[in-house]
Amino acid sequence: MSEAAETLDGWYSLHLFYAVDWATFRLVPEDEREAMINEFKTFINDKASAREQQAGDYALYNITGQKADILLWYLRPEMKELNEIENELNKLRIADFFIQTYSYVSVIELGNYLAGKSDEDPYQNPHVRARLYPELPRTEYICFYPMDKRRNETYNWYMLPMEERKKLMYNHGMIGRQYAGKIKQFITGSVGFDDFEWGVTLFSDDVLQFKKIVYEMRFDETTARYGEFGGFYIGHILKTDDFEHFFAI
């Protein structure tokens, strides 16, 4: 049997994608719409306090295209806290006009393929902790996609020897390093949590960088032979100060 790679796990993660039922929302009297928007804004701002307390974070983006209108991404120390956030959100009046189009449940993950042997507790390493319990960027653009490692009769990632997987992941990682300073990447593990094995969330102020890195990765053996992908979601940052404009109808 092949050796399983160890992982380091951080905050639990929930990506929520919603379409807005604009046709029905338009029928709501203006004063009621305004009250709903303010209630939603209060909800977002209340949950944002976790960032200052270093007990989680969030991202809010307006998704481009017909897959969704809004992405809310929450990170929390406990999975049950994500349930509480989602339940509270669903009970807001404005949620009656939100149609959930997709969601993704996972946990911030660092692969341990390239880690050397050490007696150090990695969870006490400041660099590691900053990646497991991150403060999310507030860049102009976001990209999210789920992915699997292929396992079929011809190419099965999980049957490769550990040393070969280490080599492939090293080469894969070297491509990503070329985008340091241009893209901030977060990998979340979802084996046993959702329909894919990982979620990939990218942040950048230049949306074209998403296309460049994904295209370049296509020529990497790890991706070309063993990568399988779900849908891609691209969005522009949505600030609570812009809610009035966003929800104006």
Swiss-Prot record:
Keyword terms, alphabetized: Heme, Heme biosynthesis, Iron, Metal-binding, Oxidoreductase
Cofactor: Fe-coproporphyrin III
Gene3D superfamilies: Apc35880, domain 1
GO molecular function, one term: oxidoreductase activity, acting on the CH-CH group of donors, oxygen as acceptor
Residue numbers annotated as active site: Y145
Reaction catalysis annotation: Fe-coproporphyrin III + 2 H2O2 + 2 H(+) = heme b + 2 CO2 + 4 H2O; Fe-coproporphyrin III + H2O2 + H(+) = harderoheme III + CO2 + 2 H2O; harderoheme III + H2O2 + H(+) = heme b + CO2 + 2 H2O
Entry EC no(s): 1.3.98.5
Pfam families: Chlor_dismutase (PF06778)
Annotated coiled-coil segments of the chain: none
Keyword Protease recorded: no
Cofactor binding: number and manner: Fe-coproporphyrin III acts both as a substrate and a redox cofactor.
Pathway the protein acts in: Porphyrin-containing compound metabolism; protoheme biosynthesis
Signal peptide: none
Residues binding Fe-coproporphyrin III: R131, Y145, P146, M147, D148, K149, H172, Q185
GO biological process, one term: heme B biosynthetic process
First-level EC class: oxidoreductase
Function per UniProt: Involved in coproporphyrin-dependent heme b biosynthesis. Catalyzes the decarboxylation of Fe-coproporphyrin III (coproheme) to heme b (protoheme IX), the last step of the pathway. The reaction occurs in a stepwise manner with a three-propionate intermediate.
Family the entry assigns: Belongs to the ChdC family. Type 1 subfamily.
Annotated HAMAP family: Coproheme_decarbox_1 (MF_01442)
The protein's name in its UniProt record: Coproheme decarboxylase
Source organism per UniProt: Staphylococcus haemolyticus (strain JCSC1435)
